[in-house]
UniProtKB/Swiss-Prot annotation:
Gene: alr
CC cofactor: pyridoxal 5'-phosphate
Residues annotated as catalytic: 40, 268
EC supergroup of this enzyme: isomerase
Function: Catalyzes the interconversion of L-alanine and D-alanine. May also act on other amino acids.
Entry's EC annotation: 5.1.1.1
Lineage start: Bacteria, Bacillati, Bacillota, Bacilli, Lactobacillales
Provenance organism: Levilactobacillus brevis (strain ATCC 367 / BCRC 12310 / CIP 105137 / JCM 1170 / LMG 11437 / NCIMB 947 / NCTC 947) (Lactobacillus brevis)
Name the UniProt record assigns to this protein: Alanine racemase
Length: 373
């Protein structure tokens, strides 16, 4: 997709905020515990390569991604740190992963058998590093029984093309005040890992929520994701142990303003009709940029004042009700601070009845990312 550099709409990423969030968590970790920064989905919409660089400077010793292509992007950008692909990859890509020193998540022994066959043919110079995923209650991927786990571990021990580098699970409710299900998963994890005769290099269960609120579970590595971007994993349910600094802002400018009179309508479907004479401004951003159509009725900030989005959000533009006329080029803040007022991703997510993760990841590549500080 084309990046809209000739349009006054941009995501602004605060590198210092990223650094402060990540460094704050690094300093909380017990001695010997490493932080891998999760930069999947283009760094939660913030830019994977740029976030990885800041994370490295802040003390991260490795990275986690969702798919192999994201790992290859980091390697192409010059990162030599360990990279773990959290999703299941194709066995035929095992030689490429071994060659690029990218670690694979494995959720079934038949994957190991298939990957071993490809590795035996390709004969890479190093074995494929493997992290065994355990399904302790997420219901997504992973080994569920002790028998399944020990079978996989035995296979790894007898095949030189594969190296047992790590083992992990993922908690479904670590961001909830109710710890009942979380404790059930912890117990299942402990039961499964008790079957191991030897621990691998990395043992990790902690996502952002677990590391923030259940640090005793951290073991020797945490997968630090959404909190590194300054977003509370629980939304507003649980206070963070330190101040998280949101790193993402979204700004634009007015490209047009006009006066409408009572009875005139605005936008597709004529869903908004003026009840009196008022000023309407047009902002060049829409749902093609990831600004949700369901944000009709929400607000943006103009000159520090909240201005309602009127009519439906269009593909490329939206309209707002202004208190008075403003000049073309006047700044519009869609996420972030303007004067004494601030719009947060959490506030937007609440309005859309979703989570801030979804909104952050949904901003498309048509929006340029500008990095500051």
């Amino acid at each position: 997709m084309v990046v809209g550099v000739h349009r006054p709409t941009q995501l602004v990423i605060d590198r210092q905020a990223l650094h402060d969030n990540i460094q704050a968590e690094v300093t909380r970790l017990a001695s010997g515990c490493e932080l891998f920064m999760v930069v999947k989905a283009n760094g939660y919409g913030h830019g994977a390569v740029q976030v990885a660089q800041v994370a490295k400077e802040a003390g991260a010793t490795g990275f986690c991604v969702a798919i192999l292509d994201e790992a290859l992007e980091l390697r192409a950008a010059g990162f030599n740190e360990p990279i773990l692909v959290l999703g299941v990859t194709e066995p035929e890509d095992a030689p490429l992963m071994a060659q690029q020193h990218i670690s694979a998540t494995v959720a079934a022994t038949d994957w190991l058998v298939a990957a071993d066959a490809y590795l035996a043919l390709a004969q890479p110079t190093a074995p494929l590093q493997v992290h065994l995923g355990l399904d302790t209650g997420m219901g997504r991927i992973g080994f569920k029984t002790t028998t399944e786990l020990t079978t996989a571990v035995s296979y790894l021990a007898t095949h030189a093309t594969l190296n047992f580098e790590g083992i992990f699970t993922h908690f479904a409710t670590a961001d909830s005040p109710d710890e009942t299900y979380f404790k059930q998963q912890v117990a299942k994890w402990q039961t499964l890992t008790a079957a191991l005769k030897e621990r691998p290099r990395y043992v990790h269960v902690s996502n952002s929520a677990t590391s923030l609120w259940h640090a005793a579970c951290n073991d020797n590595m945490v997968r630090f994701g959404v909190a590194g971007y300054g977003l509370n994993p629980s939304g507003t349910a649980i206070p963070a142990p330190y101040a998280l600094k949101p790193a993402l802002s979204l700004t634009s400018q007015l490209v047009h303003s006009k006066q409408v009179v009572a009875g005139e309508s605005v936008g597709y479907g004529a869903t908004y009709t003026a009840q009196q004479t008022e000023w309407v401004g047009t902002v060049p951003i829409g749902y093609a940029d990831g600004y949700e159509r369901r944000l009709q009725g929400f607000h943006v900030l103009v000159d520090g004042q909240a201005c309602e989005i009127i009519g439906r959000v269009c593909m490329d533009q939206l309209m707002i009700r202004l208190p008075h006329d403003y000049a073309r080029g006047t700044r519009v803040t869609l996420i972030g601070r303007d004067g004494d007022h601030v719009i947060t991703l959490q506030e937007m997510a609440d309005y859309c009845q979703t989570i801030h993760y979804e909104l952050a990841c949904g901003f498309t590549s048509r929006l340029p990312r500008v990095y500051r500080h």
